[in-house]
Amino acid sequence: MNQRLQRLADQIQRELAVLIRDAVNDPRLTGFVTISSIKVSPDLGYADVYVTIMEPELNDAMTMSNHEESIKVLNKAAGFLRTELSHSLKTRTTPRLRFHYDEVTARGNYMMDLISKAVIKTEENESDEQENEE
């Protein structure tokens, strides 16, 4: 991605984060929406927005159906968000927004949980071995 597209993607990310937080009032969107990254097409026709959604009431353990519902809500609000975004962008056209669930972040969190469990198990085994030696 060239520098111009990257600057535009960064600006869209900043503006969208505020718009989603303040302007999207859909009750089905209950978690905290975090924009992981944005990829803008070279012709500025589309912007693929990758988001993660954290649900504090569920201890961040949202199911895939929860994520799909949240992505549907965001995609339905994409036209409104695009219109609002066009007021702050200094481009002739505003890219169409397509929201996607960012599985990379979720996969990273899953791997961190596995590592934490492995470390705890290793520490337990080491303490058991020390007790057996005594």
UniProtKB/Swiss-Prot annotation:
Keywords of this entry: Cytoplasm, Ribosome biogenesis
Gene Ontology CC annotation, any one: cytosol
Primary location group: cytoplasm
GO terms of molecular function: ribosomal small subunit binding
InterPro entries found in the cross-reference section: KH_dom-like_a/b, RbfA, RbfA_dom_sf
SUPFAM superfamilies (UniProt xref): Ribosome-binding factor A, RbfA
GO BP of this protein: maturation of SSU-rRNA
Domain of life: Bacteria
Pfam family, one: RBFA
Location(s), subcellular: Cytoplasm
Family that this chain belongs to: Belongs to the RbfA family.
Subunit structure: Monomer. Binds 30S ribosomal subunits, but not 50S ribosomal subunits or 70S ribosomes.
Function of the protein: One of several proteins that assist in the late maturation steps of the functional core of the 30S ribosomal subunit. Associates with free 30S ribosomal subunits (but not with 30S subunits that are part of 70S ribosomes or polysomes). Required for efficient processing of 16S rRNA. May interact with the 5'-terminal helix region of 16S rRNA.
PANTHER family found in the cross-reference section: RIBOSOME-BINDING FACTOR A, CHLOROPLASTIC-RELATED
Protein name in UniProt: Ribosome-binding factor A
Natural source organism: Psychrobacter cryohalolentis (strain ATCC BAA-1226 / DSM 17306 / VKM B-2378 / K5)
